[in-house]
Curated annotation (Swiss-Prot):
Tissue: Widely expressed.
Gene of this entry: Zhx3
Annotated compartments: Cytoplasm; Nucleus
Keywords annotated in UniProt: Cytoplasm, Differentiation, DNA-binding, Homeobox, Metal-binding, Nucleus, Phosphoprotein, Repeat, Repressor, Transcription, Transcription regulation, Zinc, Zinc-finger
Function: Acts as a transcriptional repressor. Involved in the early stages of mesenchymal stem cell (MSC) osteogenic differentiation. Is a regulator of podocyte gene expression during primary glomerula disease. Binds to promoter DNA.
Entry keyword Zinc: yes
GO molecular function terms attached to this record: DNA-binding transcription factor activity; DNA-binding transcription factor activity, RNA polymerase II-specific; DNA-binding transcription repressor activity, RNA polymerase II-specific; protein heterodimerization activity; protein homodimerization activity; RNA polymerase II transcription regulatory region sequence-specific DNA binding; zinc ion binding
Main location: cytoplasm
Official protein name in the record: Zinc fingers and homeoboxes protein 3
Organism per entry: Rattus norvegicus (Rat)
Annotated stretches, region: Disordered: 1-66, 198-249, 621-642, 661-702, 885-951
Ranges of biased composition (kind: Basic and acidic residues): 661-674
Oligomeric and partner information: Homodimer (via homeobox domain 1). Heterodimer with ZHX1 (via homeobox domain 1). Heterodimer with ZHX2 (via homeobox domain 1). Heterodimerization with ZHX1 is a prerequisite for repressor activity. Interacts with NFYA.
Length: 951
């Protein structure tokens, strides 16, 4: 006995303990030696095997003896006449349809235990779910009673008894061995594997079944040595089937019998030299063993056991245990089960398999699983302008992720020839559908080597590649992830490529339209606010530069000229339509190929600086003679005839209208050119220009300024005419920029240009009161809303572009620490003469002043409460009031009039007290650097009043 125990394989069950009291009478007595040779017969006698198949009892018993009890769980479909056996209802129904045509006319599915008749397999499955919910194994046999084909269902008694014996509650638990295999991307082969394990394993020659093991012991073995597909491990199966206990003392190699085909295939995976027999079915690799999970059916009230045999559900679960919404919708259509029931079924399967993943793990597993599958994207477009295109398989990019928004396209280092986009797309060795990812390629001339960056817009699914120095859309073999632009990383710092795109647009138009801004946001990756802020800062910077050189783009390159205002630019067809604005960074010539960078977006048509053909000029001139402001229909006609873009036509008409107005102004005043030249020589004299353009009235609005006669004006008529022209014309994208677009307070740079080059926008001189209102709003908010803009426009009388421009300049000056008045306005310290007081409060203060002629300290708090003003504002009002009277007295009094008139001593005292803080910060009341000399305050200081008295 000791030797037998040592030589016996562990976990083996002695044969004499495997006999049940109610074993089949057809089972042979247990013989130690003959049992081995008997197992050699199933492959040689298929008839006997098929005859034994319809017997549920013997079939189940032999399966248990072979250690494959788990493979009988579920449905088993067999046809003994055709020697057909399967576990897939689809295959079984297909067999019945093709081989038994008479069965299709009147199908009968009978449950022998309940005498239930159904016409469809689904009806019988529903019956099983209702009446046999505790059963997990069913055997369908094809019989012919009275020459009529009938499918009879029987319940294997041994499977039921074993389940009942091993479980505490009858039919209340599902064992993990009843679940399908979770095999990724191998869904089509499960039926073969299950059929293989069940086809020959259950039977013995002549229909004799092996002794049945005890139910409890069988359950114990399965709990320890069960695969997730329901089969026992190879080592255990081979030991149970090939080595009876009576042969334990003998050599194993000499007594190994021929195994059944299903077990032999599993054995060949681990020990291919043990059994050389081949089987027509293709073997599958085994899976790792998972722990057995017991799930009470009471916890899943709506669980339908009939769903376990559905091939669609099993295949879907094998591919991925967490179905997506689209997969659930598909399964509801093909399986006719509601979505909620499908979710419950998948949840139960995951519980039985012991699968519990976090959302992050699910996404990670799905990405790893489908990393070679191009998921459907709603018509993305990848525009790749490449140089050159090389038809080499080694340069193929993996563009799968590029189809999704927010991903950039790169190229591995070490490849040459640029980026190659071909169809069909090859990714990781799989050929993808060419319709799911349309690719557009174009070729451009190869430029000189230059570092480039690739920018991908997060708002669209198109990938745009922008060249840096040449502004060409090229693909470089050495693109790395560090070259990709990220606005969140660089924040305020802009890359060379972004600056190139912004400067190129700035040379075209200092005030870009909405379409241009949207284009720049796509190209540079910056936000709309950042683009507009850059343009505002750039305009401010350009206007403050003196003596810079302007770059005029030519057809073959850029021409550098000195900005000499005295020399007018001659207007001829050979001169470019619009010169670039003088900038500090425009001193480098760029090749003409830079214009090609704007062709990547079909909606954005660039202005072409080239000579107009004679036939184009004839068509344009004839249209201009009919209507200087052509309607939309006329513009469409001109576009088709002249082959010019809309912007080019608008620019030509705008320049033509300016030229006509300039000629009319010349005729009206022949001395205008000389006065214009003299005015140009006075560039930089902000104070004189301010005195020329200051309105006679207090508000200084342009309307009052234009209301005076020509004799009263100190500005040449051509300037006024140009102002009227710019007020009436739209300042949208149809206006092309000139060279006088200023951003800071001295806004008369445009007046220094010749008649042929008028300013592109009107420049307004703001009075102290207007600036005061603007500054007050700026202190409240640096980014006014539309309502704020409307309110300040109504208060100041300034046009909206002027207000917007002033706010942009002020933000720029504040950022650079040049806004000296900001802190004083923030504290409420306003310059004298600019205090805005309600009429009722003004009358109250006036009455107090007429009574006391001065401000008493004890009355200050009372006045503040009555007028709702601060103490500083009240003191400021009294200081201004006394200063006005002091100046009036100084102007009207004679030399002998002494200080007895009024109380000048008290006045001096109060003025000194009220303006103590103001005198300390006298520089703070000066405007920012551009305003300092051009817009002095009209109100004289108290000190000047005292000086007049002493005189």
């Amino acid at each position: 006995m000791a030797s037998k125990r040592k030589s016996t394989t562990p976990c083996m069950i002695p044969v004499k303990t495997m006999v049940l009291p109610g074993a089949s009478t057809e089972a042979q007595p247990v013989e130690p030696l003959p049992e081995g040779p008997q197992q050699d017969l199933p492959s040689e006698a298929p008839e006997a095997s098929s005859e034994a198949a319809p017997n549920p009892s013997s079939t189940d018993g032999s399966a248990l003896a072979n250690g494959h009890r788990g493979t009988l769980d579920g449905y088993v479909y067999s046809c003994k006449e055709c020697d057909f056996r399967s576990q897939d209802v689809t295959h079984f129904v297909g067999h019945m349809t093709s081989e038994h045509t008479d069965f299709n006319k009147d199908p009968h599915f009978v449950c022998t235990g309940c005498s239930f008749l159904a016409k469809t397999p689904e009806g019988l499955s529903l019956h099983n779910a209702k009446c046999h919910s505790g059963e997990a194994s069913f055997l369908w046999n094809v019989t012919k009673p009275d020459n009529h084909v009938v499918v009879e269902q029987s319940v294997p008694e041994n499977a039921s008894s074993s389940v009942l014996a091993g479980e505490s509650t009858e039919g209340t638990e599902i064992i993990i061995t009843k679940t399908p295999i979770m095999k990724i991307m191998k869904g089509k082969a499960e039926a073969k594997k299950i059929h293989m394990l069940k086809e020959n394993a259950p039977t013995q020659p002549g229909g004799e079944a092996l002794p049945k093991p005890l139910a409890g012991e069988t359950e114990g073995k399965e709990g320890d040595h069960t695969f997730i597909n329901g089969a026992t491990p190879v080592s255990q199966a081979s030991a149970n089937s090939t080595k009876p206990p009576h042969t334990a003392n003998g050599p194993l190699i000499g007594t190994v019998p021929v195994l059944p085909a299903g077990i032999a295939q599993f054995l060949s995976l681990q020990q291919p030299t043990v059994h050389p027999q081949h089987h027509p079915h293709q073997p599958l690799p085994t899976s790792k063993a998972l722990p057995k999970v017991m799930i009470p059916l009471s916890s899943i009230p709506t669980y339908n056991a009939a769903m376990d045999s559905n091939s669609f559900l099993k295949n879907s679960f094998h591919k991925f245990p967490y179905p997506t919404k689209a997969e659930l919708c598909y399964l509801t259509v093909v399986t006719k089960y509601p979505e909620e029931q499908l979710k419950i079924w998948f949840t139960a399967q995951r519980l039985k398999q012991g699968i519990s993943w976090s959302p992050e793990e699910i996404e990670d597993a799905r990405k790893k699983m489908f990393n070679t599958v191009i998921q459907s994207v709603p018509q993305p477009t990848i525009t790749v302008l490449n140089t050159p295109l090389v038809a080499s398989a080694g340069n193929v990019q993996h563009l799968i992720q590029a189809a999704l928004p927010g991903h950039a396209v790169g190229q591995p280092e070490g490849t040459a020839g640029g980026l190659l986009v071909t169809q069909p797309l090859m990714a990781n060795g799989l050929q993808a559908s060419s319709s799911s990812l349309p690719l557009t390629t174009a070729s451009v001339p190869k430029p000189t080597a230059a570092p480039i960056n690739t920018v991908c817009s997060n708002t669209t699914s198109a990938v745009k590649v922008v060249n840096a120095a040449q502004s060409l859309l090229t693909a470089c073999p050495s693109i790395t992830s560090q070259a990709f632009l990220d606005a969140n990383i660089y924040k305020n710092k802009k890359s060379h490529e972004q600056l190139s795109a912004l400067k190129g647009s700035f040379c075209r138009n200092q005030f870009p339209g909405q379409s241009e801004v949207e284009h720049l946001t796509k190209v540079t990756g910056l936000s709309t606010r950042e683009v507009r802020k850059w343009f505002s800062d750039r305009r401010y910077h350009c206007r403050n530069l003196k003596g810079t050189r302007a770059m005029v783009p030519g057809e073959h390159g850029s021409v550098l000229i000195d900005s000499v205002p005295e020399v007018p630019f001659p207007l001829s067809s050979k001169v470019p339509e619009v010169p670039c604005v003088p900038t500090a960074t425009s001193l480098v010539s760029h090749p003409a190929t830079k214009r090609q960078s704007w062709h990547q977006t079909p909606d954005f048509t660039p202005t072409k600086y080239k000579e107009r053909a004679p036939e184009q000029l004839r068509v344009l001139e004839s249209s201009f003679a009919q209507n200087p402001l052509p309607p939309e229909e006329e513009l469409d006609r001109l576009r088709s005839e002249t082959k010019m873009t809309r912007r080019e036509i608008d620019g030509w008409f705008s320049e033509r209208r300016k030229r006509v107005n300039a000629e009319e102004t010349k005729k009206a005043d022949g001395h205008a050119p000389q006065e214009e030249a003299e005015g140009a020589e006075e560039e930089g004299r902000d104070e004189e220009l301010a005195s020329e353009l200051r309105a006679p009235g207090e508000n200084g609005s342009s309307e009052m300024f234009l209301s005076h006669t020509l004799a009263e004006r100190k500005v040449s008529p051509i300037k006024i005419n140009l102002k009227n022209l710019r007020v009436t014309e739209a300042s949208g994208k149809s206006e092309l920029p000139g060279m006088g677009m200023g951003v800071c307070e001295p806004e008369e740079d445009g007046l220094n240009k010749a008649v042929e080059q008028p300013p592109s926008r009107v420049s307004y001189k703001k009075t102290a009161q207007q600036r005061h209102l603007l500054r007050q709003l700026f202190v409240q908010t640096q980014w006014p809303s539309n309502q704020d803009y409307d309110s300040i426009m109504a208060q100041t009388g300034l046009p909206r572009p002027e207000v917007v421009r002033w706010f942009g300049d002020s933000r720029y000056a504040l950022k650079n620490g040049q806004l000296k008045w900001y802190e004083d306005y923030k504290r409420g310290n306003f310059p004298p003469g600019l205090l805005v007081i309600a009429p009722g409060n003004r009358e109250l203060l006036q009455d107090y002043y007429m009574t006391h002629k001065m401000l008493c300290e004890e009355d200050l708090q009372t006045l503040c409460e009555k007028t709702q003003m601060s103490a500083q504002q009240v003191k400021q009002w009294f200081a201004e009031k006394m200063g006005e009277e002091t100046r009036a007295v100084a102007d009207t009094s004679s030399e002998d009039q002494g200080p007895g008139h009024g109380e000048p001593v008290a006045v001096d005292k109060v003025l000194g007290d009220a303006c103590a803080a103001l005198s300390e910060n006298s520089e703070a009341w000066e405007p920012s650097a551009p305003e300092a000399g051009s817009e002095p305050f009209d109100t004289s200081s108290p000190q000047s009043g005292r000086q007049l008295e002493t005189d």
